[in-house]
Structure formats: structure tokens, C-alpha cells
Amino acid sequence: MPRYAIYLIAVVCCLVGCRQKQPSFRVPAQAPPYAGLTAILVKTDTLWVEIVSDPASRAQGLMYRRELPKDEGMLFVFEYPQLLSFWMRNTYLPLDIAFVSPDRRIENILPMKPLDEGPRYESRGPALYAIEANQGWFARHGIKAGDSIQL
């Protein structure tokens, strides 16, 4: 009997030792779609944004782009709170813009028409940030004025 017990223990040890190990790394819950994007939380939803904070990048914005993936957008960062005004010159995409106060609350959200150089889309009050996303993104996620963002 002891001889069989030794063989049994040896077989069990071999089987345990041959077991495939699980990888030691974990895939992040939300990996960025591609380099250069940052996740921001708008209310409770993630939007991947390209951040533009210098005058030339802010002036360029999303001009000339033909597509914007589903949960992506652009975050405009300004030096100080001010009344902001945007237009859609050379912008082919229908967008929504959310103006965000210094305390990171959405002041107002406006739909913007592609290639429309006429109207200016303006913040209701002094804003430090503006977020552009595909038209309807804010509404689909139940986001409205007064909701907060986390950077």
C-alpha cells in the first residue's frame, strides 16, 4: 500500500506541475482606441478625447476630418474662463458642443451643423473647456446642462 501511495503522490505532483499558468498581466478594462487620446468621464460615461490647449490646435479643431469614431471627441482647454464662441468652417462632421465651466459643470450643449459658417455657437457663461463629440452623443448618454465632467 505505501508503494502505491508514493506513486499516486508522484503522479499528482507531476500533473499539478504541468498545469498551465495564467498570465501575470491584466488587460486594462478600457484601453485607449489609439495613442494620443485621453479618457474623460462625462457624467458616468467615458469619452476618449484629443486634448487641444494651444491657440493653433484650438483654431484647427476638427476641421477637414471626415470621420470621428463613436465614443471619441475633442477637449478644448483655455487659459482662463471666458465666453467661448465656435463656428463650423471647414468642418464636415455634424457635432455637438458642450461648454464647461471652471468647476467642471456643463453650462450648455448645442448641436452644430457641418460647413455652417453663419452662426456662432456660444457658451452661456464663462467656460474653461469645450467638448466636441458626434452629434447626438450627449443626448444618447442622457447628459445635459448641470452634469459634471472628470478630467
Residue ranges of predicted features:
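Compact, glycine-rich, soluble single-domain proteins
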Residues: R19-L151
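Bacterial N-terminal signal peptides that target proteins for export
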Residues: M1-I6
